[in-house]
From Swiss-Prot:
GO terms for cellular component: plasma membrane. It is found in: Cell inner membrane. The chain crosses the membrane at residues 753-773. It comes from Xanthomonas axonopodis pv. citri (strain 306). The keyword Cell membrane applies. This is Cyclic di-GMP-binding protein. Keywords: c-di-GMP, Cell inner membrane, Cell membrane, Cellulose biosynthesis, Membrane, Signal, Transmembrane, Transmembrane helix.
Length: 788
């Protein structure tokens, strides 16, 4: 086994000490067996084809036993961000899988459960699969003929000393199919890595200092790709103002969690027995464990933020948000959410400059609709826009669009694309493929000139200099391919040049999307038919129209319990994940104060008994208590007496209506409803109705599952067990604004009979006006003639 020389800093050595000690003990225990061959690692069968493969060059000492108190978790490739099956092609095809380790953990054992298959054409004595961690080889897997084409499984122990904070797991195929001259890109040179491949890490906690400068660590760690679960503790039942402060903090953590999702279990009984948590307290409610002078927080004289050890768990931390009253709590929460500079274990909050009021649709996570947006502003690292090699990965750009873009009579969304690439020596099949999510858009040949479909434009482009970089291309992205969270994908395909026999050296190739490329939504208005629960589930709309939720109010049920508090915090975290900004101005009230919030969008929680507004607004709900639809009298009259295309209802028609399905809600069901606010037209209400607030956790799970999230549509969603049923109600209203000429064109295009009626009416009015005018002129002429 070849030695590896590695240099470490003092901090790294301290982090690795438990792992080094564990490996040393295991090595001593294994010396007696050093001369014996390593047994094949047992592996689970995958159908009838899954077999266990024995890797070579895997040191036995690396398979260290977990330390006491350690925890083990496994993550599949999908959970690590690879949502597709990896295919390795060519003589040296490779693929990388990044993974990271939390700041408050150290790895004591690691195992890669690799599920793979390879081509039957590979020569066993010249070919193998190589697995590396951060550039260090940890295993090589043979490609014997007996197992070729089968789905194999191998458990590969990894030396935990190789695992750092940020890591790169690399899989490489060294493949050859002949001993003579070979095509390095031959179709028989392949190996597949199954998406079920998983990485298992055993970790032990690492003590961190009580230092606010580390925030949001350890309460949220960007290196952790799992869903964030952060408990909130209130020493007594919080009032609405205290809950608003907690909501600000929850929405901040939700904005940090982003795609991971976040849930916030709430408790008013006791501090969490283990792990990290957030605590809200005033002098009268401060837990006894922190009432001593040495805690540093016993004397609360104003807004205060502190990080202290969890008295129930030496490895856990508590984030304390303290104040003399609820106003102080809100100031402390705002300081946290706005990332005010904090250091030490305890920080007293002084004056905080109020942030500027948010404008509609200016959420940091949304593509701005006020100006063209650079691609460089839509990625976290400039390197994400660059690729190299003949089998490059996709360039992915996330696009979170406002859900109410008015795209009627528009060809699509304009993109000014600038891209660079290694120019082929001669014209070939090299191309840049563009797609949105899974929908193919276009192919741009890599000829050194912009692509044009019309003959005159191709002739014009041919007059330009070939190979001038960057190449500029105007694209129009069809709006039908977009979802609330879309991905614009670019794939550079480089065609290998035809070389001479046995001369297979090819030039290095690379491609890049210029960071100054732009997408422009500034020409679109905002106007949408409501209710639209797809927009709510995916983007929190209409509440997130203003990123700070300054026009949104959450209405609690009577006597809310811990689970109700948790649901409120999780919803605000969901809104923060959508906007990328904390909900600084969301209001939380009881049903009795709803009249004072008539001009705001409302979010209702509770059961038919605990939420009084469900009874007060029964006539306005899209579905009644008996499961039947409710309509306004005028709408009934129109549906009964006029053709459907004359109706004001321009909703989508591919969903069943609430009148067409007899619902029989069960106690475990969750009913999600959207309707226009009875208090003010143009304002929206979204209501969650369930007998047990704990059922809401299943709805949140559905939101985090893309296969279920897409089923949230229409104005009513019924969650029964794990089934999502979407219905469309019979009331439609519109939010947003259109210029009058645009609104008239849109309205009459959807209601041709009303257009005809309006034209006839205008013709009659013009005829009447002309008749009156002509009679007046005739009378004047007769009067003039009589006077003569």
């Amino acid at each position: 086994m070849r030695g590896v020389s590695v240099c470490f800093t003092r901090t790294q050595l301290m982090r690795m000490f438990p792992a080094v000690l564990s490996c040393a003990l295991t090595l001593l225990a294994g010396l007696a067996q050093a001369q014996q061959p390593m047994p094949a690692t047992p592996s689970a069968q995958a159908g009838s084809q899954m077999q266990a493969a024995t890797p070579s060059q895997v040191p036995v000492a690396f398979a260290a036993a977990p330390l006491p108190g350690g925890s083990t978790r496994a993550a599949t490739l999908r959970e690590l961000g690879i949502d597709y099956e990896i295919t390795l092609r060519g003589v040296q095809g490779s693929a990388g899988v990044p993974f990271s380790v939390r700041s408050d953990e150290i790895v004591t054992a690691a195992t890669l459960n690799l599920k793979y298959s390879y081509s039957p054409s590979l020569l066993p004595d010249l070919s193998h699969l190589k697995v590396t961690i951060n550039g260090v080889t940890v295993a090589t897997l043979p490609t014997d003929k007996a197992n070729a084409g089968k789905l194999l499984s191998a458990d590969l122990p990894i030396d935990p000393r190789l695992v750092t904070d940020y890591n790169q797991l690399n899989l490489q195929l060294i493949g050859h199919y002949t001993r003579d001259c070979e095509d390095p890109d031959h179709s028989s040179l392949w190996a597949n890595v199954d998406a079920a491949t998983s990485l298992s890490l055993t970790t032990t906690p690492l003590a961190l200092a009580n230092n606010l400068a580390l925030l949001p660590v350890p309460f949220f760690d960007m290196r952790d790709t799992r869903r964030l679960e952060l408990p909130f503790y209130f020493p007594q039942r919080p009032d609405t103002a205290t809950l608003q402060a907690a909501g600000t903090v929850a929405s901040w953590f939700g904005s940090l969690a982003g795609y991971r999702g976040a849930v916030f279990p709430a408790s008013t009984e006791a501090l969490p027995a283990s792990g990290n948590a957030v605590v809200f307290a005033t002098p009268g409610t401060l837990p006894a464990q922190f009432a001593t002078a040495d805690s540093g927080v016993a004397d609360i004289r104003g807004p205060t933020v502190a990080v202290l050890a969890n008295p129930n768990d030496r490895n856990g931390k508590l984030l304390l948000v303290l104040g003399r009253n609820s106003e102080d709590l809100q100031r402390a929460a705002t300081a946290l959410a706005l990332r005010a500079p904090l250091t030490g274990a305890v920080a007293r909050i002084g004056d905080i400059s109020a942030p500027a009021p948010r404008r509609p649709y200016d959420a940091p996570s949304w593509v701005s609709s006020e100006r063209p947006v650079r691609f460089g502003d839509l990625v976290t690292q400039p390197s994400q826009l660059n690729v190299a090699g003949y089998h490059p990965d996709l360039i992915r750009i996330g696009l979170q669009l406002p859900p109410d873009l008015f795209v009627w009579k528009r060809d699509g969304i304009p993109v000014a694309l600038n891209y660079r690439y290694t120019l082929p020596e001669q014209d070939n099949k090299s191309a840049l493929n563009v797609s949105i999510n899974e929908s193919f858009l276009t192919t741009l040949p890599l000829t050194g000139r912009p692509f044009a479909q019309s003959t005159p434009m191709r002739w014009w482009n041919s007059l330009g200099t070939r190979g001038s970089m960057p190449v500029h291309q105007d694209l129009t992205l069809p709006v039908g391919a977009f979802s609330a969270n879309s991905q614009l994908r670019f794939h550079f395909f480089f065609d290998r040049p035809q070389g001479e026999a046995c001369k297979n050296t090819f030039p290095d190739v690379s491609g890049a999307i210029d960071a100054d490329s732009t997408i422009d939504l500034s020409g679109f208005h905002h106007y949408m038919a409501m209710p639209n629960l797809a927009a709510f589930a995916n983007a929190g709309y209409p509440f997130t129209r203003l990123a700070d939720l300054s026009e949104s109010t959450i209405v609690l049920p009577d006597n809310p319990g811990d689970q109700d508090l948790s649901n409120v915090l999780t919803l605000l975290g969901h809104f923060g994940a959508s906007t990328g900004y904390p909900a600084l101005h969301a209001q939380i009230i009881g049903a009795g104060a709803v009249q004072q919030h008539a001009g705001r969008d409302l979010l209702l929680l509770g059961s038919a008994e605990s939420q009084p507004l469900f009874k007060q607004w029964r006539a306005h709900l899209p579905i009644g208590q008996d499961g039947q639809a409710t309509r306004f009298a005028l709408t009934d009259w129109l549906f009964e007496r006029l053709p459907r295309f004359l109706s004001f209802d321009a909703r989508r028609t591919d969903l069943p209506t609430t009148a067409e399905i007899a619902l029989q809600p069960q106690p475990d069901d969750v009913l999600l409803m959207g309707f226009e606010s009875p208090l003010k037209s143009g304002r929206s209400v979204v209501a969650f109705q369930t007998e047990d607030p704990a059922n809401m956790s299943r709805l949140f799970d559905a939101w985090f599952d893309p296969t279920l999230l897409k089923d949230f549509q229409g104005s009513v969603v019924l969650l029964q067990q794990n089934n999502v049923t979407s219905l469309v109600g019979n009331q439609t209203y519109y939010v947003g604004h259109l210029p009058l000429p645009t609104w008239l064109r849109w309205y009459f295009s959807h209601h041709p009979v009303w257009l005809a009626f309006t034209v006839v009416l205008l013709a009659l009015l013009l005829a009447l006006a002309a008749r009156v005018l002509l009679r007046r002129r005739t009378a004047e002429r007769l009067n003039d003639g009589g006077g003569a």
